[in-house]
């Protein structure tokens, strides 16, 4: 009967308790085949998935954004875990002992810790980057360049290497001897459960708290920005229009304009040419004509106005000349002008007038430039609405992706780190199989991440499909 002895091993950023046996055979043949099949499949899916992520960002320009460069770095870490860490740990589980020697053991542990810590650092960078994007939208994007992203990614990897690699590789030389048996593989300075728990606090619990707080702020700020930039509906536009018409743009007393004022009204638009006066006065009429304006007066009015106490603003009165004259021709607009006439809509309230202004075509000849101007303004408005909608869609897409990544990280890493906490106070409370499952869950996080990108980002999903189906011509158009 095998004699199992619990020992300490490694798991990502912490240590895991492994078992060894005197007979060097922990599982039956069927069990070993099953374990190798499952773990080998997970390793293959992890490698393929993260290669797809890296290729997608490389070949699709729509995915070449600062945020996705951070995901590229995270995919590199996940790829290393899938290609090396998963398979080496599977060998350790199936064999029941470490068969590859001390040098390979230390190299594996150093690689495992550095890569796992780099993954956590990348998650922190993604969270902080998104937090500053939504809380400082005017100042931070100017500094958020590709160069800055590269420096942050390099800092994450260098810091992870400095923190773990020298200590793992050279601790035995610092203390003067190697205390890890040849048939086992674990970090020598983490053999104390209290030290292991301290590393778990620094490497998992603290980052999780920081990322959770940041995500809450990101979510609240994103909702606020999306609501603020939401396109106005018809009711809101109508309400604003009515408010504008009711606002006192111009208040004035109703007075009779001085002589010659009406003659100058035609030039107030600034784009109408003053036509020469007619050679002969208008034809005689037996009585005076009256042209009453109820609620509007035009900027091209040429008659004198006369004060009237009724609700109409003015009454236009024409005198009766003595000699006939040819019919007046309509005044021509300047061909170079792109403006139309200005109509002043006026309402009288007591002794004051409330006036609003709107642009209307003066003549058929002026309708075309006015229509061009209107079309340009309409096009600008449509572009602004489209940009606001695109921005809101990007906000939701990035926020969903970050949420999925953080959720996957917390769900897969929490079981093992809870066991680390329990093991600090009770080293015999957790079965060896449970330790192994918790350890593997940390690795499974690297398998889940590419699925999170595809589920939360349609562009990633389409690019994955084009790459898998070898539809390379469609990759550049995937959105």
Curated annotation (Swiss-Prot):
Keyword Membrane: yes
Membrane disposition: Multi-pass membrane protein
Compositionally biased tracts (Pro residues): 275-286
Modified residues (Phosphothreonine): 459, 463, 477
Subcellular location field: Cell membrane; Postsynaptic cell membrane
Residues glycosylated per entry: 8, 13
Any single Gene Ontology cellular-component annotation: plasma membrane
Keyword Metal-binding: no
Primary subcellular site in the record, as a coarse category: membrane
Signal peptide positions (record): none
UniProt keywords, alphabetically: Cell membrane, Disulfide bond, G-protein coupled receptor, Glycoprotein, Membrane, Phosphoprotein, Postsynaptic cell membrane, Receptor, Synapse, Transducer, Transmembrane, Transmembrane helix
Chain intervals for the UniProt region annotation (Disordered): 271-333
Entry's transmembrane regions: 32-54, 69-89, 107-128, 149-171, 194-216, 402-422, 437-456
Feature: compositional bias, Polar residues: 294-304
Protein's job: The muscarinic acetylcholine receptor mediates various cellular responses, including inhibition of adenylate cyclase, breakdown of phosphoinositides and modulation of potassium channels through the action of G proteins. Primary transducing effect is inhibition of adenylate cyclase.
Name listed for the protein in its UniProt record: Muscarinic acetylcholine receptor M4
Biological source species: Homo sapiens
Gene behind this protein: CHRM4
């Amino acid at each position: 009967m095998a004699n199992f002895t619990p020992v300490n091993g490694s798991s990502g950023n912490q240590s895991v308790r492994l078992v060894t046996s005197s007979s060097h055979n922990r599982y039956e043949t069927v069990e070993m085949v099953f374990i190798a099949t499952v773990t080998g499949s997970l390793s293959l899916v992890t490698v393929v998935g993260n290669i797809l992520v890296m290729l997608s960002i490389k070949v699709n320009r729509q995915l070449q954004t600062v945020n996705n460069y951070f995901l590229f770095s995270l995919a590199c870490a996940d790829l290393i875990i899938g290609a090396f860490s998963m398979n080496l740990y599977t060998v350790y589980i199936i064999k029941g002992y470490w068969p590859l020697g001390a040098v390979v053991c230390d190299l594996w542990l150093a690689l495992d810790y550095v890569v796992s810590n780099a993954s956590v650092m990348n998650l922190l960078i993604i969270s902080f980057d998104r937090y500053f994007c939504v809380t400082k939208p005017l100042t931070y994007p100017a500094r958020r360049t590709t160069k800055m992203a590269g420096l942050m990614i390099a800092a994450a990897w260098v810091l992870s290497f400095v923190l773990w690699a020298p200590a793992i590789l050279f601790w035995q030389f610092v203390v003067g001897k190697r205390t890890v048996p040849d048939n086992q593989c674990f970090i020598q300075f983490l053999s104390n459960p209290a030290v292991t728990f301290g590393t778990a606090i620094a490497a998992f619990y603290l980052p999780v708290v920081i990322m959770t707080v940041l995500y809450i702020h990101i979510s609240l700020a994103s909702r606020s920005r999306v609501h603020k930039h939401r396109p106005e509906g018809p009711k809101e536009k109508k309400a604003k229009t009515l408010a504008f018409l009711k606002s006192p743009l111009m208040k004035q007393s109703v007075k009779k304009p001085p002589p010659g004022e009406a003659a100058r009204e035609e030039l107030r638009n600034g784009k109408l040419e003053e036509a020469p006066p007619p050679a002969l006065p208008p034809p005689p009429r037996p009585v005076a004509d009256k042209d009453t304006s109820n609620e509007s007066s035009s900027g091209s009015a040429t008659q004198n106005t006369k004060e009237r106490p009724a609700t109409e603003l003015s009454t236009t009165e024409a005198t009766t000349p003595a000699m006939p004259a040819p019919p007046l021709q309509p005044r021509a607009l300047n061909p170079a002008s792109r403006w139309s006439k200005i109509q002043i809509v006026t309402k009288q309230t007591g002794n004051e007038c409330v006036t609003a202004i709107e642009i209307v075509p003066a003549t058929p000849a002026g309708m075309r430039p006015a229509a061009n101007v209107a079309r340009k303004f309409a096009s600008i408005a449509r572009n602004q609405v489209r940009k606001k909608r695109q921005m809101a869609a990007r906000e939701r897409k990035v926020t969903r992706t970050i949420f999925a990544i953080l959720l996957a990280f917390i769900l897969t890493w929490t079981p093992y780190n809870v066991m680390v906490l329990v093991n600090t106070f009770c080293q015999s409370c957790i079965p060896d199989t449970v330790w192994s499952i918790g350890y593997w869950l940390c690795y499974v996080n690297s398998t889940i991440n590419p699925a999170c990108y595809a589920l939360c980002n349609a562009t990633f999903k389409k690019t994955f499909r084009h790459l898998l189906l070898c539809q390379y011509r469609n990759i550049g158009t995937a959105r």
